């Protein structure tokens, strides 16, 4: 489950980490991307990393589904785009 207190700062920190390290092939999105600034990221992966900045540990991708990630990101004002 995605923590309810996740915020823009956590998402932006996760985006910076992805910019530095890339996206592991097994964490690529099949259908959707989230727009953060000028770049797009896999919604589930960015949420997993963002939780690390909130709770200190990455959220396992098996602990939530893609629609939860999309809803959380949209609630924070991010645009979800089809790949």
Q: Residue locations for each model-derived region?
A:
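Terminal leader/tail segments of proteins
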Residues: 1-83
């Amino acid at each position: 489950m995605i923590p309810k207190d996740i915020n823009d700062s956590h998402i932006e920190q996760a985006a910076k980490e992805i910019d530095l390290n890339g996206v592991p092939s097994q964490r690529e999105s099949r259908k959707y991307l989230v727009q953060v600034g000028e770049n797009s990221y896999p919604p589930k992966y960015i949420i997993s990393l963002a939780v690390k900045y909130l709770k200190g540990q990455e959220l396992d991708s098996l602990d939530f589904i893609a629609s939860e990630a999309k809803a959380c990101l949209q609630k924070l004002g991010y645009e979800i785009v089809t790949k």
